[in-house]
Regions:
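Strongly charged
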Residues: 1-109
């Protein structure tokens, strides 16, 4: 599995926009900070929809008074909290559902 970092995204943006890396990096940082800020300020839930990419959603979880620690088998209480969820767009879903043989000949621009 390949791991892509923010630096890789900055490179792609710089290449796509035909600008130097040091000019593209603040743009990527600003987008990431805007997404993170929106999620962290969610009261208590929010939904960030990015067309042709997907939806980030902050959801509330219920408290689990009888959860179990898998290592010790001890019964523990897990309080209600928020979590993030990502739902890919139809475009991404269709791409990911392609048979692997077809993907070998497909390159994303």
């Amino acid at each position: 599995m390949i791991t892509y970092t923010k630096r890789d995204i900055v490179r792609r943006v710089a290449e796509s926009m035909d600008v130097p890396l040091n000019q593209a990096e603040p743009w990527v940082d600003t987008i990431i900070e805007a997404l993170r800020g929106t999620i962290m300020e969610a009261d208590p839930t929010c939904r960030i929809e990015l067309r042709d990419f997907g939806v980030f959603e902050v959801k509330e979880t219920k408290a689990k008074p009888k959860a179990r620690n898998p290592k010790t088998n001890e019964v523990i209480y897990v309080p209600a909290h928020r979590k993030t969820h990502f739902k890919p767009s139809k475009l991404l879903k269709e791409f990911l559902r392609q048979p692997l043989e077809e993907l070998e000949n497909h390159k994303v621009d």
